[in-house]
Amino acid sequence: MSPAIDIAIVGATGTVGAAIVEILEERDFPVGQLHLLASPASAGKSVSFKGRNLRVKSIEAFDFAQVRLVFFAAGQAVTRQYASQARAAGCMLVDLSGALPLQQAPRVVAEVNPQVLEKLEAPCQVTSPASQVVALALALAPLRPLVRWRHLGVTACLPVSSLGREGVAELARQTTELLNGRPPKPRFFDRQIAFNLLGRVGDSDTAGHTGLERRLVEESRQVLDAPELKISVTCLMAPVFFGDSLSLAVQASQAIDPSAVRAALERAPGLELIEPDDCPTVIGDAVGQDVAYVGRVRTGVDDACELDLWIASDNVRKGSALNAVQLAELLIKQGR
């Protein structure tokens, strides 16, 4: 048993922050004092942890010298504002916002590239990548001995919880209005999300790509250690509360053996292969689980060098909170 360490969770009242609290308890993480931090508006709320009710504190007055490990589960602006304070206090940082540069806080998926952690200088900074990258990396990493990638094509259907509690509340409100015969009035989203599919998540740059799409490309390349890999990404917002659904098309430089691919996926950690005659879904399979699900493994209709997959994963749990806690466990195991 590792010695107990004092921990802070920034963004503790959000969907991911709350999931981190739950997973720390479930995995019997060696927690000493747990400090739950949020904005002043959320300060004073109560969160249950190991049979105790912990009071949420305002991050504005918090002294990071009180803790050894900090999870940043808030937005990028909050991370940019407070990460330097935590690092100056000598804390290990596990970021989930993607605010820190790739070179300073490398993106790591626990089952894919944990060796990166061994090279970090103290105090360590590491980033748990976007939940969609976690799902993609879990499915792609086992295929490296079998498939020489030339290009990845990704269509990612995101749930409204990827934008936090506000997204969840907005979908619930719009759905209720429609089912009661009232036209929904968009507030959080710029148009109707209930019973609809939005073809863009966030603002586009001059080339037409969103910040999230660029993030997925950059983080996937780093996690897979494939800096030159060509990746095309389209992110959609789906009228789903929780769970990422991804369509992945891999263009290889040689013909692909689907049987060998299935065998590799079946052995892969953090992944569950669904039978060929079935298809994983976020509601029926992925949500609440500690693995990502992959199915519909097949080659292209008329191209033996194309591999197509369908992936379903819990964006809050497997894709975010669990990976962050696993990274912290690895750092502690290394004696950081």
Curated annotation (Swiss-Prot):
It comes from the Bacteria. SMART domains: Semialdhyde_dh. One of its GO terms (molecular function) is protein dimerization activity. Gene3D superfamilies: Dihydrodipicolinate Reductase, domain 2, NAD(P)-binding Rossmann-like Domain. GO terms for biological process: amino acid biosynthetic process. Belongs to the aspartate-semialdehyde dehydrogenase family. This is USG-1 protein homolog. The gene is usg.
